[in-house]
């Protein structure tokens, strides 16, 4: 049974009903409707912590979806699942693919920065200063790009860039 038919949560049910209505009224082809249904089910599974099911749905949505922007959001959600599972390199690969399709996704840039910062902290704890510096530099680069796209967001990242001296002046304008 499709996930959309077995939701017990009121919010999930409401989202599913609204999504189904939108699918019925929007003039779109059957393949796009199927892709959205898989994407919707993937988001629902992800929200329930059912990551394997979420990935299956996202992979099917990605196979069906033709719109580059929509594909970018599918890849973004897949990356979130991989990151939640501690598969940081796989998450970074998905984020890179999402950016290749839509370079104006500050949330992707932010999440890539978070992963690199995390990996930098781990390297620092292990005494691997070169790797830590490399990861922190990557984090700074991704956060700087995210802040340029969304200047009012990522305040903690802005503070980190300032306190570590890794940010350039144009990021704070």
From Swiss-Prot:
Presence of keyword rRNA-binding: no
Superkingdom field: Bacteria
Keyword hit for rRNA-binding: no
InterPro entries assigned to the protein according to its UniProt record, in alphabetical order: PSI_Ycf3_assembly (IPR022818), TPR-like_helical_dom_sf (IPR011990), TPR_rpt (IPR019734), Ycf3/AcsC/BcsC/TPR_MFPF (IPR051685)
Biological process annotations from GO: photosynthesis
Main location: membrane
TPR repeats (start-end): 35-68, 72-105, 120-153
PROSITE patterns with a match to the protein in the record: TPR, TPR_REGION
SMART domains according to UniProt: TPR
Bilayer topology: Peripheral membrane protein
Record keywords, A-Z: Membrane, Photosynthesis, Repeat, Thylakoid, TPR repeat
Cellular compartment(s): Cellular thylakoid membrane
PANTHER family attached to this UniProt entry: CELLULOSE SYNTHASE OPERON PROTEIN C (PTHR44943), TPR REPEAT-CONTAINING PROTEIN MJ0263 (PTHR44943:SF8)
Family: Belongs to the Ycf3 family.
UniProt-recorded name of the protein: Photosystem I assembly protein Ycf3
